[in-house]
UniProtKB/Swiss-Prot annotation:
Family stated for the protein in its record: Belongs to the SEC61-beta family.
Annotated GO biological process: protein transport
NCBIfam families named in the record: PRK01253.1
Localization per record: Cell membrane
Encoding gene (name): secG
Protein name stated in the entry: Preprotein translocase subunit SecG
Description of how the protein assembles with itself and partners: Component of the protein translocase complex. Heterotrimer consisting of alpha (SecY), beta (SecG) and gamma (SecE) subunits. Can form oligomers of the heterotrimer.
General function of this protein: Involved in protein export. The function of the beta subunit is unknown, but it may be involved in stabilization of the trimeric complex.
Transmembrane segments: 30-49
HAMAP family: SecG (MF_00751)
Intrachain disulfide bonds: none
Amino acid sequence: MAKEKTTLPPTGAGLMRFFDEDTKAVKVTPKGALAIVLVFILIEVLLQIIGPRIFG
């Protein structure tokens, strides 16, 4: 006797979505991310300029 083949349910034509639900995470807009990066750059520049005077 031949073995029966088991078939799996279709997965949406090969496309799978892992994050269908909204996750509970911090949401940052692109403008917010840019602002955070610019603040870090400004802090770095200031530390390069006045850091040696403060930290010896």
